């Protein structure tokens, strides 16, 4: 029997993290989920074993957080591109000898019209930049990354799809996007809407992250193939070697094995 005070810290904010949380609470395991926005809180079911903390944690706050909440196991189900939090937590878990496991679905196979680039710099400043020059390009990389494309505003017709938040809009405008080249949509975006948007803007290329099917990448692959549009996928950042799985049952077993009884 698991110690009733022992808690699993689930780094969440993703659809995958909801599945992880549901698996843990089904076993009666106390689960504390952290998310960075109040909207993400609604991903999770209401349950006596589940608590959701809203707000980002700094590296300095995490050790106190672990102690205050009696964290015995850490499950990282953050976004594949949330490399900073993964790197930070991995180091702290090792230092404090807290069992750590990461849940991450494998990347999708490359589609027929998909080109993968190693990082955003190779696309905006490196050898893949010609794929953007002179083209009508839709950027679906998140508002925080739009500044990387600022210097290309005079070399391509760039459009940005962002989340419907004031901060995201401010970041897009600061990166040089005018109101007629910005659309705010909350995912998931259905295939017909995705296709209609690309056609409306006469898109010739789309830049996305390798976020997997849950991140809408599969829909983009289908639309790219249907319309003959080039899809440029930014590869996931390299993860620190360690415990990682895409099997929910392994997450459950890991927690059961490492939680004190």
UniProtKB/Swiss-Prot annotation:
Domain of life: Bacteria
GO terms under biological process: cobalamin biosynthetic process
EC number: 1.3.1.106
Gene Ontology terms for molecular function: precorrin-6A reductase activity
Name of one Pfam family that matches: CbiJ
Keyword Lipid biosynthesis: no
UniProt xrefs under InterPro entries: Precorrin-6x_reduct
Pathway(s) annotated for this protein in UniProt: Cofactor biosynthesis; adenosylcobalamin biosynthesis; cob(II)yrinate a,c-diamide from sirohydrochlorin (anaerobic route): step 7/10
Catalysed conversion reaction: Co-precorrin-6B + NAD(+) = Co-precorrin-6A + NADH + H(+)
Record keywords: Cobalamin biosynthesis, NAD, Oxidoreductase
Class in the EC hierarchy, top level: oxidoreductase
Physiological role: Catalyzes the reduction of the macrocycle of cobalt-precorrin-6A to cobalt-precorrin-6B.
NCBIfam families with a match to the protein in the record: precor6x_red, PRK08057.1-4
Family: Belongs to the precorrin-6x reductase family.
Protein name: Cobalt-precorrin-6A reductase
């Amino acid at each position: 029997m698991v110690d009733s005070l022992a808690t699993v810290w689930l780094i969440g904010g993703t659809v995958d993290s909801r599945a992880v949380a549901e698996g843990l609470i089904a076993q009666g395991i106390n689960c504390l989920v952290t998310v960075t926005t109040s909207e993400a809180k609604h991903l999770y079911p209401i349950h006596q074993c589940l608590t959701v903390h809203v707000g980002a944690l700094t590296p300095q706050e995490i050790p106190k957080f672990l102690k205050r909440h009696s964290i015995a196991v850490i499950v990282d189900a953050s976004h594949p591109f949330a490399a900073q939090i993964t790197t930070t937590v991995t180091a702290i878990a090792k230092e404090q000898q807290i069992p750590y496991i990461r849940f991450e679905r494998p990347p999708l196979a490359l589609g027929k019209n998909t080109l993968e680039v190693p990082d955003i710099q190779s696309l905006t400043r490196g050898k893949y930049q010609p794929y953007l020059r002179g083209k009508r390009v839709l950027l679906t990389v998140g508002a925080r990354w739009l500044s990387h494309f600022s210097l290309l505003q005079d070399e391509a017709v760039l459009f940005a799809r962002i989340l419907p938040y004031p901060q995201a809009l401010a970041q897009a405008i600061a990166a040089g996007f005018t109101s007629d080249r910005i659309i705010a949509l909350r995912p998931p975006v259905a295939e017909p809407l995705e296709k209609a948007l690309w056609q409306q803007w006469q898109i010739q290329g789309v830049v996305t992250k390798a976020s997997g099917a849950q991140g809408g990448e599969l829909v983009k692959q289908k639309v790219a193939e249907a319309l003959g549009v080039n899809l440029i996928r930014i590869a996931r950042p390299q993860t620190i070697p360690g415990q990682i799985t895409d099997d929910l049952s392994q997450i459950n077993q890991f927690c059961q094995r490492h939680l004190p009884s």
